[in-house]
């Protein structure tokens, strides 16, 4: 299993989903599911390719006077680090179907800005089916896309 990087707010929904992935990976005999959490405060830098798991904030509605609103500011800060951005290989988004058309929209934003595949989306903490589909999908993704550079870095 390749590395995951994720952000979870104080609601812990995304964190719980990542914990479910880890338990299911162990139960399958696949070993640990390495995951690094982007902190609420402070900085981290990664050193291995990863898939990002991110929640969508606020129904995507921007804060008055500020641009954005879909992607948590901690994730924006993390991805603004050139090294971290160079190692992202895909994105998985969490959200709430109450957001309507903006459900899991953070994944769409990050996929477009970082030029990486939008691999999956799930609601809130995800279901057992989501966990299985993500684990299966990540296995296939890393077989087909082993540690490649994102498209925007291939031509530099």
Swiss-Prot record:
It comes from the Bacteria. It holds the Pfam family Flavodoxin_NdrI. SUPFAM superfamilies: Flavoproteins. Signal peptide: none annotated. One of its GO terms (molecular function) is FMN binding. InterPro entries: Flavoprotein-like_sf (IPR029039), RNR_Ib_NrdI_bac (IPR020852), RNR_NrdI (IPR004465). One of its GO terms (biological process) is protein modification process. Probably involved in ribonucleotide reductase function. NCBIfam families: nrdI (TIGR00333). Belongs to the NrdI family. HAMAP family: NrdI. This is Protein NrdI.
């Amino acid at each position: 299993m390749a590395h995951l990087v994720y952000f979870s707010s104080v609601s812990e929904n995304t964190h719980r989903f990542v914990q479910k992935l880890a338990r299911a990976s162990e139960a399958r005999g696949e070993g640990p599911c390495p995951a690094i959490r982007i902190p609420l405060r402070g900085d981290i830098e990664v050193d291995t390719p990863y898939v990002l798991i991110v929640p969508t904030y606020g129904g995507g509605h921007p804060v008055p006077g500020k641009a954005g609103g879909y992607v948590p500011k901690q994730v924006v800060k993390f991805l603004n680090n050139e090294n971290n951005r160079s190692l992202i290989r895909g994105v998985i988004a969490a959200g709430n179907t109450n957001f309507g058309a903006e459900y899991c929209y953070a994944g769409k934003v990050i996929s477009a800005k970082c030029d990486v595949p939008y691999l999956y989306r799930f609601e809130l903490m995800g279901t057992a089916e989501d966990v299985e589909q993500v684990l299966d999908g990540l296995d296939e993704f890393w077989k087909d896309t082993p540690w490649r550079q994102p498209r925007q870095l291939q031509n530099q």
